[in-house]
Amino acid sequence: MKLFPYAHATHPQWQLAALLVLAQLRSQMALPAYAAGPTLALIYITDHYANDAQDILDHLSAELPLVTDWSGTVGIGVAANNVEYFDEPGIAVMLLDIPADQYRVFSGVAPLGLGFEAHTALVHADGATPDLAELVQEMALRTESNYLFGGVSSGREQGVQFAISGDGNMSGHGAAGGVFSGGLSGVAFGAEVSMVSRLTQGCKPVSASRTITEADNNVVVTLDGEPALDVMLRDLSLSLERPQEALQMVRSTLVGLVHPLEMGGEKTAQATTAVKQTGNFGNEVLVRHIVGLDPGRRGIAVAEFVEKGAQLAFCQRNVQAAKADLIRICAEIREELEPEDTTPHATKRIQGAVYVSCSGRGGPHFGEPSAEMQIIRRALGDVPLVGVFASGEIAYDRLYGYSGVLTVFTD
């Protein structure tokens, strides 16, 4: 199989950006190394173009008649190989050369049919959807691998999603023409689609992992039997006698949570702690904001339902830790595709990649424009890639924050 054609552009007028995208796609499809007739497109636009989403989709689909299926969303930024368009107009498109019987585009109004066995799925979500975390879990259960990858739309306007199936507009969309908001949409893939996916966390633990010994909805009341607020102040070396300093530090602090497993009808602590021996978070850790303090019970409120038996560690965003972990997952992907103990002809080649990163990681977070994508290019190589900066990242059956999800398609 050949490389996936991809393109990206920015311009104040979407028509000119689309013109540049089409020129890039057509030039690549004319090259022997790239697929000449792919039928599935991924499209990501920045929120500067959100109000023009329908016109953009109509134009691109008319100019690319062989492409019968479209999926995508909007973000505060979009990405491509070696470049980011963050908080500015931007379009990124990739054309996937995958057999038609190995994928299905779906949405909330045109859900995945029973006739297709999904092995995994790329999922785009609207953050305003009620019970989103539960919907993601339910969607994961509908796949053979119980693994999803994707993200939650981000931007200043209402979330926009794209979904068109092979026979035109998806049933139920009516005049929407493949552009809508709310719920989940994406692409389900069959078992014959070869891919490797990894999650990278962007926060560094600044405390030991502790067990939640009392909780009330989203309030952590005690940690290891002590008032949670007292534990946090001690771990962060803070004093309420210096309230401004304490408030500033708490605002920049998050929590890494590992929910307890359900075993034998009773809640028990995870076999693993939130913090690995290497000092970083594993895939099972969910990073969430501290949203308030409870002086009466000396507890802390977090942006997640918590329960007794969960593991918790305080953490902070850390650029160096994020860079190192991003390089790590790229190295793991390359190792899986090019294991040292295989002959050269057994090496798999990357056809294309999708990267969903947190909007909090984009822009200046890595020190300079497009720095995150440049790290991926140096570590993974010069491969076709598109992506989006999301307000929540989807991996496995969960919603993550301050993370990145890198997925590569292989031959």
Language-model regions: role of each:
Residues 56:
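Contiguous, structured surface segment used for ligand recognition
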Residues 1-50, 59-62, 67-353, 358-366, ...:
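Small-residue-enriched flexible segments
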